[in-house]
Protein backbone atom coordinates (compact mmCIF):
# COMPACT_ATOMS: atom_id res chain seq x y z
CA UNK A 1 0.00 0.00 0.00
CA UNK A 2 2.85 2.37 0.84
CA UNK A 3 4.50 1.78 -2.54
CA UNK A 4 1.27 2.68 -4.33
CA UNK A 5 1.01 5.93 -2.35
CA UNK A 6 4.60 6.86 -3.25
CA UNK A 7 3.96 6.15 -6.94
CA UNK A 8 0.78 8.26 -6.88
CA UNK A 9 2.67 11.11 -5.22
CA UNK A 10 5.44 10.97 -7.83
CA UNK A 11 2.87 11.00 -10.62
CA UNK A 12 1.09 13.97 -9.04
CA UNK A 13 4.37 15.90 -8.79
CA UNK A 14 5.14 15.14 -12.44
CA UNK A 15 1.71 16.34 -13.59
CA UNK A 16 1.96 19.48 -11.43
CA UNK A 17 5.42 20.30 -12.84
CA UNK A 18 4.09 19.93 -16.38
CA UNK A 19 1.13 22.22 -15.67
CA UNK A 20 3.29 24.87 -13.99
CA UNK A 21 5.69 24.89 -16.92
CA UNK A 22 2.77 25.44 -19.28
CA UNK A 23 3.43 26.18 -22.92
CA UNK A 24 6.83 27.39 -24.07
CA UNK A 25 7.49 31.13 -24.22
CA UNK A 26 4.66 33.02 -25.93
CA UNK A 27 3.20 30.92 -28.67
CA UNK A 28 4.98 31.93 -31.87
CA UNK A 29 1.86 31.42 -33.98
CA UNK A 30 0.83 35.04 -33.30
CA UNK A 31 4.37 36.35 -32.88
CA UNK A 32 5.20 39.62 -34.64
CA UNK A 33 8.69 38.72 -35.88
CA UNK A 34 7.59 35.37 -37.29
CA UNK A 35 4.87 37.06 -39.33
CA UNK A 36 6.91 39.67 -41.19
CA UNK A 37 6.73 42.44 -38.63
CA UNK A 38 8.97 44.11 -36.10
CA UNK A 39 8.20 45.36 -32.60
CA UNK A 40 8.50 49.12 -32.23
CA UNK A 41 8.19 51.26 -29.12
CA UNK A 42 7.56 54.37 -31.20
CA UNK A 43 4.45 55.28 -33.17
CA UNK A 44 3.39 52.99 -35.97
CA UNK A 45 1.00 54.38 -38.65
CA UNK A 46 -2.35 52.60 -38.55
CA UNK A 47 -1.97 51.18 -42.07
CA UNK A 48 1.32 49.52 -41.14
CA UNK A 49 0.15 48.06 -37.82
CA UNK A 50 -0.06 44.28 -37.56
CA UNK A 51 -2.20 42.47 -35.02
CA UNK A 52 0.53 40.19 -33.64
CA UNK A 53 2.10 39.78 -30.22
CA UNK A 54 4.96 42.01 -29.04
CA UNK A 55 6.50 41.90 -25.55
CA UNK A 56 6.64 44.91 -23.20
CA UNK A 57 3.57 46.58 -24.67
CA UNK A 58 5.25 47.41 -27.98
CA UNK A 59 3.41 47.69 -31.28
CA UNK A 60 3.87 45.27 -34.14
CA UNK A 61 4.70 47.14 -37.36
CA UNK A 62 5.33 46.00 -40.95
CA UNK A 63 9.06 45.62 -41.59
CA UNK A 64 8.92 47.84 -44.68
CA UNK A 65 8.10 50.78 -42.42
CA UNK A 66 10.96 52.82 -40.92
UniProtKB/Swiss-Prot annotation:
Domain of life of the native organism: Eukaryota
Disulfide topology: 32-54, 39-61, 44-60
Signal peptide: 1-22
GO biological process, one term: defense response to bacterium
PTM annotation (Tyrosine amide): residues: 65
Posttranslational mods: Contains 3 disulfide bonds.
Pro-piece positions: 23-26
Keywords: Amidation, Antibiotic, Antimicrobial, Defensin, Disulfide bond, Signal
Subunit-level organization: Forms dimers and higher-order oligomers.
Membership in a protein family: Belongs to the beta-defensin family.
Name of the molecule in the record: Panusin
Organism ancestry: Eukaryota, Metazoa, Ecdysozoa, Arthropoda, Crustacea
Amino acid sequence: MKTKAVLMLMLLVLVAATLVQGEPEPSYVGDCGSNGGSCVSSYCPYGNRLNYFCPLGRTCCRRSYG
